[in-house]
Structure formats: structure tokens, C-alpha cells
Amino acid sequence: MSILQAAESMPGDLAVRLADADAEVRRIAVMELPYSDEDNILPLLLKALADADPQVRAEAAKAVEGFEEPEAVTALLGLLHDTMEETRRAAADTLSELKSSSNSGLLLQAVDDADPFVKAAVFRALRPLRVADSLAPALSGLDHPSPQVRREATGVLGYLKHAGSLGPLTRVAMNDPDPEVRRIAVGALGFATDVEVLPALTHALNDSSWQVREEAAGTLGKLKLSGAVDYLVTAMADRYWQVRVRAARSLGRLKAAVSLGVLSEALTHEISNLRKEAVIALGEIGDPRAIPALETALEDPDPDVRKLTQLALKQIQLNNPPR
């Protein structure tokens, strides 16, 4: 008996309602399935995934999350071509929650689909699985005409952290016409281990999109590239405070004493998040020359800033014991 045939013979009120002529009754029954006492609800879910009503199929696509069986994955891949957008998106969302790499084979079979939505959804599902066989399709996806496909392909490469993708990711970070693709590529360069990516990241600090600049400022700090200090100091004057926050955080990680001036200036910024990051960075740098500015911050109107300032001052004192 097949898994779908098993659904036909399964007793219980839910099974009866899933066969009701009223689509709304079936839809509500699907919503209840994950919370039912049925020992094996997968056959019922698979039947609902093939329901004649698109709303029922959409609910089934949501309800099947957590099932890793090939039958469920195959059915969800089929729903990526559904006539209703809600159903397609529900299927894509559930596929993105797959945890077992054993499903990568089914996903890779669909990665060359001509539909950009399907292709992007498959890349999105492959990303957390980190399977080596997704490298080649993802590299190819960087040149796809659809920005959504390029975004998801770039995300796959970021998760794989393969040295062979550094060059292509650098090119994308600097040249892709879509700002979100550039932002994802900049973040993906965070797995690099040398200064090869420094030109691309410093270039990104001048990107027209502030989200790309923000990502670049953060990535430079993660890599702890000393050659980035001057660029990060300049980024502390960015017109978007979100970029300054990341730059301040990175300057602290780099323990860049040359940034004491710009970090001290940030202690008076109207955005408290930036003041907090500047205080933390000054504490990490540990230079006694920051003490006067930090003592002023002890009167900050934000209690979190005041608390962090006390910690930063203690940190500086510990790093500079009296002789």
C-alpha cells in the first residue's frame, strides 16, 4: 500500500473532514493536523498537498514543515509551480526549513528549473544544507538575469565558504546591479582568511546603498584586517548612523587607537545605539586617552550608555595598571 493509499483508509474525524466537499472545512482540518492525536499524519498531509483547492494546498504546505521524507519534499517541489502565489511561497518557506542533507539530491534535480521563482527557492533550501554539490550551480547562478536567483545563489556560496568562490563573490560585491545581491556578497566574503578581499570590502564602504556600506563595515571587523582601519575611520562620518554603528564596532575589534577621535565624537550623537557602540569600542581599545570623553558619557541620558561607560572605564583601568 502506498503512502497516499494509506490516507484513504485512515480513520478519524480529521480524515473525514479532509474529504469534505467544502474546501473551507478541509482547510481548517489541515490546520488542525499538526496538533492532532493521529499517529501518522503524513499520509493525510500528502493528500492535502494535492487538494483541488489552492487554499487547502497552501495550508498543507505550511503544515508539512518538519517532515523530511522524500515524498513530502517531492510534493513541495511540485507546489513551487502552483497557480496560486500563496501556495508557492508557503512551499518555498517550508523547503527552506529542511535540515537533512539527504534531501539535497531532490533539490539539486530541480535547481536548473527555468522558472526563476523555483530556482531561487531551491537555492534557498540548499543554503543551510551546505552540500558541496551545490557549489557549481550556485556559481552559475551568479550570472542569472533574475536578482532573486542571484541573491539566493550568493547566499549558498556564503554558507559553503569555499575558497574557489572568493573571486566570483568579489566580482559580485563590486559590480552586481542589485544592491541586495551586493550586500549578501559582501557579507559572504566574511569567511576569507587573507587581505585578498580588502579592495572589494573597502570599495563597498562607498556603495550607493547604505545597507551595503553597513555590511562592509561589519565584515571588515569580523576579518580583523588592519589595513581597513583608515577606511573605517572615514566610515564614521557616513550620513547613515547604521553604518557608523558597524564601523565603531569594527574599530573596537581592531583595537584601532587612531580612531579615538571619531569614537569620542560619536559619544554625543543623537542615536543612543551609536553612543553605546562607541563606548564599547573605546573600552576594547583600552587607551587611557579616552578616559576624559568617557567620563563625560557617565552623564548620558541613556542608562545603558552610562552602564557601558562604567564598564569601559574599568576595562581601561585593568589594561593600564598603575606602575
Residue positions per predicted region:
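N-terminal alpha-helical scaffold/docking segments in eukaryotic complex subunits
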Residues: M1-G66, K307, K314
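Short inter-helical turns and helix N-cap capping residues of alpha-solenoid HEAT/ARM repeat scaffolds
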Residues: A21-D22, A52-D53, T83-M84, A114-D115, ...
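Core register positions within helices of long alpha-helical scaffolds
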Residues: E32, A63-G66, T94-E97, A125-P128, ...
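Core solenoid repeat modules with strong leucine/isoleucine-rich periodicity
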Residues: F67, E86, L98, D115-P116, ...
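Ankyrin-repeat and related helical/solenoid repeat scaffolds used for protein-protein interactions
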Residues: A237-L311
